[in-house]
Amino acid sequence: MTWGFLKQGIFRERSRVGKQKFYHCVSRYFHYLPPVLAILLPVGSWPFLSEQQWRYSYFLFPVVSSLGWLFAIGLRERQLRAAAGQLLETKIRKLTERDEGLKNIRETIEKRQKEANRLKLHNDKLVERLGQAREVVIQAKGRYDHMEEKSRKLHEENKQLQMQLEAAVRERNEKILENQELRQELKETLAYQQELHDEYQATFVEQHNMLDKRQAYIGNLEAKVQDLMCELRNLLQLEVGAKTELPGRPMASRDVVAQLVLEFRKIVFRVETTEAADSLTALRYTRTDPSAHNYSLACRQLFDDLREENLGMLFIYAPFAQRVLFANALFKDWTGHGLEDFLNKEGDVVLEGFAQWERDLLTESRTERSGKIVIKTKAFGATPFYYCVVTLDKGPLAEHVLGVLYPAKASFFTNLSYI
């Protein structure tokens, strides 16, 4: 490191000597520059001056030239003084060279001068190093202050984290206590539910035994109901056979509609009575029979009963689906058409009264609706028919329409006997 500083000092000394030589050369000839500029400036600007400016130039140019010459003379005096000092120093050196004592003193002075220069150079190096050390100290102090500030912030963050940790620990302890309380409540709830389950299980077994007893009782009643149903059907059939005329025998033309409505009500009552009787049977309480099977069985039994009726052209119609569910064989026998043809507005089966006929079929009223329509039969042409319809109120075909059609003329059966 010492050799590096020494090389750096030598380089700086050489640079200083070179600069002194350059400045000495420049200062030697610099005193010629101001007078030359003082002379050339007015001469060079003379062609560019106006006539009015020429008047002032006679006064301006001598002043400028005088100032330039005064400046040059001052520089020259300083150079002469410097040259006199150098000449005096040279003479002193020559005198000291002749005298041995003065020569020794001079050498001593030169050595001390060199030592002073060396010390000065060393001092400059020390000052420079001191400046560098001061910069390092300042930087270290800045870093120390930065670290101190950072340490303070970290300390504050540590306090905040410690407070958060304590809050989290307290919350955790509270959650643990709450969890223990919830577990205790859950155990008590489970115990209570187990007691309820045992109680419900005992109640279910008791109710199941009671249902088995009632099922056995209902099974005993079923046989009695079936016997009563058979007797009721026999009585109804006897009543119908006594009061209802066969299709081959014409009704009285004066009260055909009233008698048709009366007989139709009996059929409706018989259907509803059948449904009520079926609802009392054990099939309603049997857990093994599905409801769809019971529904289809009840409908099939109802259709079989309606096929045995000979009041007229009986049918069952679903208004919400606009679909025919049942129609007996008299439709084909008397008219040669199916019930679907009677409901077709675009067809030519219903010649008169179609609007009222359609309105009565789609009406949701529970009362009987009756009327008259003219039908184009395949065998006899246009033939009037009375009709009576009603919306069923209960049973498997509730909300469906039950209806009957009957010829309005007694001659229809006379003509039918010839076919």
From Swiss-Prot:
Disulfide pattern: none
Pfam families (alphabetical): PAS_12, UPF0242
Family under the similarity heading: Belongs to the UPF0242 family.
Protein's name according to its UniProt entry: UPF0242 protein TC_0906
Annotated organism of origin: Chlamydia muridarum (strain MoPn / Nigg)
